[in-house]
């Protein structure tokens, strides 16, 4: 149980740190300290820090004492692997729809930020759920065919982080897009595609 608690705490501290970096307050502080050029490099730096700081969290399940919970036997494990493959594909498609290079911060770094208003994406995967990247991420981790106590702790922590993150993102999108996003919420599920899109 000690390993379980350590991993959950590690995910919690990572989530707080990651959310703090993404907050408008920290972005405003960075802009005040470094000037308008911050807009060009902040997203790229944010992603780099997020990836580097996630590495030790992901390493903990392999480094700490662990216990197997279950392993789905062949050929049934192939079903899980197919679902994971589809989830991985959905991640790529979803990122491409919303602007992969912008998401990574590369576009902002190479060219000055555009003054045009951001566009609300409601087509493609976003016709089925409002947060397809989170849906795909959850499917990717929970359909792993082998489960251990350490992986369970990691996946629980990451799932809570994704769900809380989705709620905060909903608030931000409502502020950013107003009535257009409120209307989108009425007709599109948040994470689970429970209806056929119109």
Give residue spans per PLM region.
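Hydrophobic transmembrane alpha-helices
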Residues: 3-17, 115-198
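Residue-level signature of transmembrane alpha-helical entry/exit and packing/kink sites
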Residues: 3-7, 43, 47, 77-84, ...
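Alpha-helical transmembrane segments of integral membrane proteins, especially early/N-terminal helices
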Residues: 4-14, 40-56
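Transmembrane alpha-helical segments that form the membrane-embedded catalytic/substrate-channel core
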Residues: 10-24, 56, 60, 84-107, ...
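Membrane-helix interface linkers and caps
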Residues: 20-37, 62-72, 172
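Juxtamembrane helix-capping/reentrant segments at transmembrane boundaries
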Residues: 30-49, 72-76, 110-123
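Membrane-interface loop-to-helix entry segments
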Residues: 46-48, 77-89, 123-137
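Long, highly hydrophobic alpha-helical transmembrane signal-anchor segments
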Residues: 48-84, 146
